[in-house]
């Protein structure tokens, strides 16, 4: 049916609430199941229709069947298919009843579709079926299903849920404790049923045959070619050949308890307590009635979470320009995603002290890059530097990291002492300022709108920080900075300081443990930030990009209330 085509009803129930379509969901010997709609609730339902002239011979039988199906509609259990209503169409000689619709068909269809089902899942199904049988057998009056088989057990595969259905042939035991009519499927019929003197234990026998089929994926007595052969074996106490092909001894013992003679057969309630069915719910994601699983909120698993469904492959390019200081190169990494988003990351490179391979490894770690190898990134860094420094050479020599990528003349003098002094001075500028602007500026219009977490690595546009005068108050340092996310100075211009202090007073407790916000929210794009700074401030800012630290927790706040280890620092 075309999705835009209006579905036409073939017929409706007497109230007009349920409308039946021509689409057939299943067909049995006496019943056809159609798809229907409940107009009141707006849900799809199953419309079962029984041709009465094929199963009934008198008006007494007709009234009895209608009464029993009507009573069955009052049953309410999680392992019993839900009945909504039933009625007899006198003109068409049909019995109709509405039940809930199942998404995965019958248990036989489901098991034949998925052959490699774990025994623990099969045990879960068995427990659900037995719970339904216990409910039926302890009902007042007791209810015998009389036709329990995998074709009459229905599955919601996305929930791991099974329910007993097709109760139209069930029989209620009223004043007596046994029934006397022969009805059912020969392969699943207990020996005493042929003798026309039986009770609810015939359902336990049928359950044993169902479990045998679930374990072996074989229809019971498939070796027989005629119902008469099946009858002869059943009344003679001969078990189906599939029983002897069960590899699990405990499973075979469990099935055998169901298939013994009625005098030795246990009830469904006793069978439910068998050690073989002992529940081990620790392995399951869903169990019947257990609801949703608890989230795995621990540090190791949180690190593996992806905030978007699809991994985006990235394109990367690196360009550079001479820095304001000797021996410094300002590098820009451009990262472009397939969805059109892009990121620019700016960082300094000290040609006398840094090596491209070390910086590349740092990039992979700090920016969580998974689709580029450090060696590939190092080559791009070398290419950018060699375009500015003619005698820069690249060597793949991991054994000599201090000489790696540093082959040039003395046109640049060493700045190691300057870097050291800058690092020492940075220890005097503290993280409270960083925490304040992280908290206050989350919704500033200057935040970059061009980045979104790809599931591969953090694509934050990091803020470049200013260096302020020596008159700023000295504060204790709480975490290190990296070349990709430098630490914000705590000394602010007078107009900004008050705003930051106000934010800090309300958010300090949160900022002290969670200095970050969700990864897929970008920080301020550095180039847009530069538009608001004077050339002097820009020059001072560049001198702060000198150290390598840990950026793991900068710019990220855990979406769950879980404990996190303090970020490790590195140089």
From Swiss-Prot:
Q: Name one GO molecular function term.
A: protein serine/threonine kinase activity
The record's catalysed reaction(s) read: L-seryl-[protein] + ATP = O-phospho-L-seryl-[protein] + ADP + H(+); L-threonyl-[protein] + ATP = O-phospho-L-threonyl-[protein] + ADP + H(+)
**Signal sequence range:** none
- EC no. given is 2.7.11.1
The record ties this protein, via Gene3D superfamilies, to: Phosphorylase Kinase, domain 1 (3.30.200.20), Transferase(Phosphotransferase) domain 1 (1.10.510.10)
Quote the InterPro entries the UniProt record gives: Kinase-like_dom_sf, Prot_kinase_dom, Ser/Thr_kinase_AS, WNK_Ser-Thr_kinase
The keyword ATP-binding appears for this protein: yes
Q: Which residues form the active site?
A: 166
Which of UniProt's keywords are assigned here? ATP-binding, Kinase, Nucleotide-binding, Phosphoprotein, Serine/threonine-protein kinase, Transferase
Which family is it part of? Belongs to the protein kinase superfamily. Ser/Thr protein kinase family. WNK subfamily.
Protein name per Swiss-Prot or TrEMBL: Probable serine/threonine-protein kinase WNK4
């Amino acid at each position: 049916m075309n999705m835009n085509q209006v579905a036409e009803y073939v017929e409706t129930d007497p109230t007009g609430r349920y409308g039946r379509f021509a689409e057939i969901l299943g067909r049995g010997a006496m019943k056809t199941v159609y798809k229907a709609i409940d107009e009141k609730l707006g849900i799809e339902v199953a419309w079962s229709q029984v041709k009465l002239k094929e199963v009934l011979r008198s008006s007494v039988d007709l009234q009895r069947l209608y009464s029993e199906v009507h009573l069955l509609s009052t049953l309410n259990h999680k392992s019993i298919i839900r009945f909504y209503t039933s009625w007899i169409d006198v003109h068409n000689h049909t019995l109709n009843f509405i039940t809930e619709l199942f998404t995965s068909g019958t248990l036989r269809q489901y098991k034949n579709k998925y052959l490699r089902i774990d025994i623990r899942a099969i045990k879960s199904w068995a427990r659900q079926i037995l719970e339904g049988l216990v409910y039926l057998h302890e009902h007042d009056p007791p209810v015998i299903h009389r036709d329990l088989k995998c074709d009459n057990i229905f599955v919601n595969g996305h929930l791991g849920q099974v329910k007993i259905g097709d109760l139209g042939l069930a029989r209620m035991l009223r004043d007596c404790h046994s029934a006397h009519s022969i009805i059912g499927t020969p392969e699943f019929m207990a020996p005493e049923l042929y003798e026309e003197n039986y009770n609810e234990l015939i359902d336990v026998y049928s359950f044993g045959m169902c479990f045998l089929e679930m374990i072996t994926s074989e229809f019971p007595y498939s070796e027989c070619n005629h119902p008469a052969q099946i009858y002869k074996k059943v009344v003679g106490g001969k078990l189906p050949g599939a029983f002897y092909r069960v590899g699990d001894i405990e499973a075979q013992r469990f099935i055998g308890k169901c298939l013994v003679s009625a005098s030795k057969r246990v009830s469904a309630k006793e069978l439910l307590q068998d050690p073989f069915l002992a529940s081990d719910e620790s392995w399951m994601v869903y169990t019947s009635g257990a609801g949703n699983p608890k989230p795995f909120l621990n540090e190791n698993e949180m690190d593996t979470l992806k905030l978007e469904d699809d991994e985006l492959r990235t394109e990367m390019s690196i360009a550079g320009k001479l820095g304001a200081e000797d021996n410094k190169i300002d590098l820009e990494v451009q990262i472009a995603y397939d969805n059109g988003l892009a990121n620019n990351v700016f960082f300094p490179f000290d040609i006398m002290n840094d090596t491209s391979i070390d910086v590349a490894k740092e990039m992979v770690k700090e920016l969580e890059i998974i689709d580029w190898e450090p060696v590939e990134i190092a080559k791009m860094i070398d290419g950018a530097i060699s375009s500015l420094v003619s005698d820069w050479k690249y060597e793949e020599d991991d054994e000599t990291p201090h000489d790696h990528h540093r082959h040039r003349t003395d046109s640049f003098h060493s700045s190691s002492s300057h870097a050291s002094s800058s690092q020492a001075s940075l220890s005097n500028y503290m993280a409270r300022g960083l925490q304040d602007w992280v908290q206050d500026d989350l919704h500033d219009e200057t935040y970059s709108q061009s980045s979104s977490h790809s599931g591969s690595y953090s694509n934050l546009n990091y803020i470049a920080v200013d260096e302020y005068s020596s008159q700023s108050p000295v504060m204790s340092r709480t975490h290190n900075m990296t070349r990709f996310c430098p630490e914000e100075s705590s000394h602010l211009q007078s107009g900004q300081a008050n705003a930051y202090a106000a934010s800090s007073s309300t958010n300090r407790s949160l900022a002290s443990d969670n200095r970050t916000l969700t990864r897929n929210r970008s920080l301020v794009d550095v180039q847009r930030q530069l538009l608001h700074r004077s050339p002097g401030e820009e020059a001072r800012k560049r001198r702060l990009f000198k150290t390598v630290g840990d950026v793991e927790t900068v710019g990220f706040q855990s979406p769950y209330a879980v404990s996190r280890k303090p970020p490790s620092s590195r140089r």
